[in-house]
């Protein structure tokens, strides 16, 4: 049982802080974020991000989207070494054409051992189960219609979402997201900035559309439909896409 919480603590080193703050800005109109259908993805193409912690490259993150019957499946791998510790996260996420969850599974491999996290849905219930050292803890909750499932520290989840909606500058989009590693749902406010921002991605300087989320303390940088960088200022982490 102790290891479950220890591993969860390790995961949160690399994830965003769950500090919930009210975010409001009168200059932005507000719309609900709704996905009508999945679009803008490349079937079977591996997307790779370099993982930086405190400006030091500590690993990589990759994801792939494939068709899975009438649904879609996203496989992700995070491989990080930081502070003398190794951490590997392998996830499989199945979702429908509206980007709503069907099932989720995560395997966490760390120096302390292996932890399995799974999320299942039944009727209006959502349950995350955490298994370590042969002990399973179930964390039940109510599923609200339209809630997205997103691993906040994994850019693939966000990139598929952003590619599947038409985002307008100067608009704040609201949504509910369920984060399996926290086994909780959060209200998110995605603010699309009116002005582009120049950033370096590898050796290229790109003028990016900027999306900020205050509750999860995340910043996203979009260039020509691609999520090229995701930042968590509070955690000192940056995930930057390898452009090919």
Which residues does each predicted region cover?
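Short, hydrophobic alpha-helical membrane anchors of single-pass surface/secreted proteins
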Residues: 2-8
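Acidic, serine/threonine-rich low-complexity disordered tracts
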Residues: 5, 13-123, 169-244
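Generic hydrophobic, helix-prone segments enriched in Leu/Val/Ile
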Residues: 19, 141, 157-163, 190
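Short, structured patches in soluble enzyme cores that scaffold and shape functional sites
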Residues: 78, 108, 130-132, 159
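A short, hydrophobic/aromatic-rich structural module that often spans a beta strand
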Residues: 124-128
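Acidic/charged, solvent-exposed loop-and-adjacent secondary-structure segments enriched in E/D, K/R, S/T
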Residues: 130-155
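Beta-strand/loop-rich accessory regions of lumenal/periplasmic or secreted enzymes
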Residues: 147-170
